């Protein structure tokens, strides 16, 4: 599913046809590729989170500190199941997974089941 977010003065999106991260500085009238690397897996969802962008990929949770130009793994092995969506819950990061609702208090490094 394509995902688009606003981050600073830019719009940032996943181009699912190419699995690229793209950005626009003119309200989406034109798009430029920012990241075309596939080492992070297939991008599925984006979330602005403080000064980072978090991404759900086919390999887990990844983060970027340079507007999506490069990605680092934050959580690639978890008993939480497959990540489906992320939400900024204020003091916690929330994730809907294939096994239910999970929360993290360390930017997605570890996950705990919410009952």
Predicted regions and their residues:
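Repeated scaffold domains used in trafficking and secretory/extracellular systems
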Residues: 1-8, 40-49, 80-90
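An edge-strand/N-cap motif at the start of beta-rich repeat modules
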Residues: 1-34, 112
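Hydrophobic beta-strand positions that form the internal "hydrophobic ladder"
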Residues: 11-13, 53, 93
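Loop/turn residues immediately N-terminal
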Residues: 18-21, 59-62, 99-102
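Conserved Ser/Thr-centered positions that define the repeating blades of beta-propeller domains
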Residues: 24-25, 64-65, 104-105
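Short coil turn/linker residues within repeat-based beta-strand modules
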Residues: 28-29, 68-69, 108-109
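Surface loop/turn motifs at the tips and blade-to-blade linkers of beta-strand repeat domains
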Residues: 35-39, 75-78
């Amino acid at each position: 599913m394509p995902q688009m977010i606003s981050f600073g003065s830019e719009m940032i999106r996943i181009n699912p046809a190419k699995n690229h991260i793209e950005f626009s500085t003119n309200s989406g009238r034109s798009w430029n590729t920012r990241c075309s690397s596939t080492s992070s897996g297939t991008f599925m969802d984006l979330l602005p989170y403080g000064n980072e962008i978090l991404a759900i990929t086919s390999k887990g949770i990844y983060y970027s500190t340079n507007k999506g130009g490069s990605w680092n793994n934050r959580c690639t092995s978890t008993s939480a199941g497959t990540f489906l969506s992320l939400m900024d819950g204020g003091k916690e990061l929330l994730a809907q997974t294939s096994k239910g609702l999970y929360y993290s208090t360390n930017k997605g490094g570890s996950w705990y089941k919410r009952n």
